[in-house]
Amino acid sequence: MNVDAVSRKLLAAIALSTPGLLAVLVATTSAPAQGAEPQRFDPLLARPPELDKGKLLPGDDQMLVCQSTSFRPDKVLNLADAVDLALCYQPQVQASWAAIKLQAAQLGEARAAYLPSLSAGASQYRDNSSSTQGSSKRSIGTLYATLTWRLLDFGGRTANQRAADVLLQAALASQDAALQKAMANAVGLYYDAHSARAAQQARERSLALARQVLETAIKREQRGVGALPETLQARTFVARAELELARAIGQHKRALVALAVGLGLLGESEDVPALTLSSEVEEDPLGLEQNLPAWLQSARQYHPAILAARAQVEAAREKVKVARSEGLPTLDMSASRFVNGRPNQGGGNRGDRETVVGLNLNIPVFEGFARNYKVDGAHAQVEQREAELRDVQAQVLGDLAITYAEATTALRSLASSRSLLEVAQRAVDSVRRKYDVGAADIVEMLNAQSALNDAELERIRSLSDWRSARLRLLANAGEMGRASLAAAARR
């Protein structure tokens, strides 16, 4: 006979013999069919809405919802796209989602402790006996159902539920911190790759200008105006420019690979995806919105890593209450219904019906002092969580102060790097005009060109350092959102 058919007959027989259990049995057996996905069945409402609707980042008006088709290798990658990919593909972010699901499941278990539990069973007995007077055969089936419900436990379930609730909030805050860290990492890697590409382009311009200087030196030598040493110096400069360009190309490729790894894209393809970065518009910076004390005060109150550590401390304190309550009395109620006798006691008489209702009071008297040590361990865990909170606060505030110093330094260097580049460009133009008419030698021309190369690289580094530090400052303060990327990148 089909197992499902046997189960249905068993439950129907118990329900008919015990009418009060009918509603409970129907609710128990039909509940899993309410959701298409078993993991989404949440009758106790323990699952946070972020798991179904997505995450809302600071300053955003749209939820973060990841899609498997969001990455296309042929698409030009801007900063917002890079951040979105990091938020969806990075293993650390995916692990934070799993941690939320785990804590939600534990919260559901804690809430389930307030509900009764129902179990049912069946047994079949066959008795074949024979004697000098003949033989007999007897077959009887036994059905039973038991309902148990904890009525009183002196606060243990309440403390356990509060701890689970706080740990879920800690998991949500930890995920916020993981998202901010992922965005900060993506911003740094993106601007490293962007800076490497700009450096490669600067080396290409330097090589083109060096070749122009070489052509001019060759023509001057052919006309008898220049000398062979000048031509050789120009050739040396071209060879050096080619070497520096080759190194810049290698650094650019390395930065793109590091960006792909940091965004978690290597797991999406068999090879390293070919990334193409968008061009950044150079605009005048607007400066920092707040001073360092304001940033630090905001981080102390709202940084997700600090909020998560505080929640861990609160959960540890609730665990102390749980440990203490386990040594207190508990009161349970049980109700059982037996049809055709009790199980494991041989076959009863057909048609027998028995109902048993009872209260069970359990009073722990002596546990070998284990309860004392368990409470001491719970107190020690509170001290450990408090120390971890202080460590997280120091780490967050220290990183924020360092990033603020980097941002202010990069902001001050922007104007200097622009002036340096403008002066170096005018110097090259002036020396080149003089060199074309024979009023300057090759050494002066090459020195001016080398100074221009250095000025271009300094400008590239200054812009990259400012944009990266500005956004990392937002992330280290726990305030970065996708909507703020475009505006913040121009400051």
Q: Which residues fall in each region the model found?
A:
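Terminal intrinsically disordered/low-complexity segments used for targeting and assembly
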Residues: 1-85, 249-297, 475-491
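Periplasmic alpha-helical coiled-coil/stalk elements that build and connect Gram-negative outer-membrane
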Residues: 166, 173, 177-298, 403-406, ...
